Amino acid sequence: LMRSSAASDVYKRQVFTMTEKRDDLYLPSREFVEQAHIQSRAEYERMWKQSIEDPDTFWGYIAKDFHWFKPWTQVYRGEPEIGDNEWFVGGKTNICYNCLDAQIEKGRGDKVALLFQGEPEADCKRFTYNDLLKHVCRFANALKKNGVKKGDRIVLYLPMIWQLPVVMLACARIGAVHTVVFGGFSAEALADRMLACGAKKMVTTNGYWRSGQKINAKANADKACMLCANAGLTIDDVFVVDRMVDFEVPYITYRDTALSKELMLDEISDYCPAEKMDAEDPLFIMYTSGSTGSPKGTLHTTAGYMVYTYTTFKYIFDYKEDDIFFCTADIGWITGHSYIVYGPLLNGATTVMYESVPTYPEPDRFWHIIDKFKVTIFYTAPTVIRALMNQDIQWIEKHDLSTLRLLGSVGEPINPEAWHWYSHYVGHDRCPIVDTWWQTEAGGVLISTIPGAFGSKPGSAALPFFGVKPVVLRSRTSGDEPAVEADVNEKGELCLVSAWPGIMRTLYGEPERHQNGYYTQQPGYFFTGDGAYKDEDGYFWITGRIDDVVNISGHRLGTVEIEDALLSHPAIVEAAVVGYPHKVKGEDLYAFVILDKNSKESEEDIRKELKAVVRSDIGPIAVPGKIQFVREMPKNRSGKVVRRILRKIASNEIDEISDSMINILAEPGVVDEIAQNRIGDK
């Protein structure tokens, strides 16, 4: 977690005053409510109740908004308590058709569908729905010409370039199952995912821009293919997108195809008919981050995912026809799938896609994009917010952000100070904030504010979305112990009772892992792996992953709370807390913190003050035994702290930090730096 030193001292005092009470409620303006899709909590509760008690009627009504080649015979069939779920049984549709053709049929052919901003400022492209359909069909026909067919699994190892959503939609159009692998992953991580899904075809690029540097993506793709071959999987075809001009990469003649040349062939038609997909046909496989363990391939299917992403986008972002939507996620993660590509396009929206990082060439790149494209809805991660908080406020003030009407947060709980900074400096205290909680397994948002219906509490994910019934359960200590719901404000394990259309159907090729990982910890419930509590207003507060709980002398403590306390000190920019073995307590707390560059106090004085803050805010039991000052955290290329590495350092298991852990880091050298300065045992 991070905090800012960039805001004025006056604003810092305001933040602390405003966040002393965790139940502060911030309501949307009357003007916002009057134009919102859902305008009261009572209306929300009526809709939510119907979605739980009568899901067939609720979701069946929404599904009528789509084009179906054949109508469904049953809305839902299954046993949610064991993860056996089918939606829109017997129906046939195509998500690409509904993203593009159906929008054109509704009169949106000349509306801008995709605004692409490359890292070079001049590299800006606008695609209407007509344009996008033409590009998608040509890509689809090129893939079909080269042997890609319905049911084939195809890996997309592409960065944030406009061809990525085009190829995704092309796969969906012809029934191929796409597996997007984050462009920042190493060859080893890419090969792991290719082997896991058995993909024999890949789309990659010759290179891309990252912070002013040309990155050779093809080299990683070639190495991954070699690793797959060594493991017994031969990659038959690699299709190469020429992103970089005058950037030569080697081609393997028997395997590689330059898509740019294929697309110029006369035989590649501008139209490709959409495959009639069964509602439960696979759409994509999305692998979880490689930061921990072997990758898990969540399998999402066609119709349920389509209906759910459409609905969450419409209501959570209160989408209107003239909105410009900017989600800063990478499409290599589920947020980019659902809220850069599928959710916006299914609603006929204009979606913004940016190639690179928020701080290049200057720390105002996001604010510049918002100003340039007149963005109305901005959706980003707390990690990004906290990083930009640490920049001078002038980078925001030089841009016009007045078109913004709604802000969103995704990826992790947002600490209250970051929430207030985001609201004040980006939203000018007039934009509601939707703090969304969900997972790769979910397909779309599960808990969030509905911005016109009820207010936000800084740090709380708020209330469940339609079709989602969360409960907080006490931990079970034995296999035959029944599930017990936690009391109000009592921390426990966040589980889900019901099924919703977007839920993954299984882990690809690993049905037992699917069952054991999600349905055995609390039998009869979907186990999210997150801790939470529910307050007296029904709002849910996410306390972090269950494995981020440390047991000190029999007391279970969530590290997120301790990080929040450390961040309340004005000299701390970022904090990460992990457990390490202690011969008396069982475990103790090890805090890694980054100092504000403008801090004048000595490290020893700050260390004492930090312990005092934690003692005051949480209690003596939560005071970290060790506090180490670091220059940078070990983060993967999506900006998330890899806590597994910090645990190894804290536990003095440095020799167990494998190359596969280090390969996913944006700055691998930081590991040695932190390890060399590890605080030893006295």
Question: How would you describe each model-predicted region?
Answer:
Residues G304-I324, I334-T376, Q391:
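Conserved AMP-binding/adenylation subdomain of ANL enzymes
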Residues L1-Q14:
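Single conserved hydrophobic/aromatic residue that forms the stacking wall/gate
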Residues Y315, Y354, D371, R405-L407, ...:
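Conserved AMP-binding/adenylate-forming
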Residues L169, R173-L263, A381-P382:
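Structural core segment of the AMP-binding/adenylate-forming
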Residues V240, V584, S616-V641, D655-D681:
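AMP-binding/adenylate-forming catalytic domain of the ANL superfamily
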Residues D110-V112, I235-V241, D246, I252-Y287, ...:
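Conserved pre-ATP/AMP-binding loop-to-beta segment of ANL
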Residues K49, C96-Y97, L114-L169, S186-A191, ...:
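Conserved AMP-binding/adenylate-forming core of the ANL superfamily
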Residues V181-G207, A221, D371, F378, ...:
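AMP-binding/adenylate-forming catalytic core of the ANL superfamily
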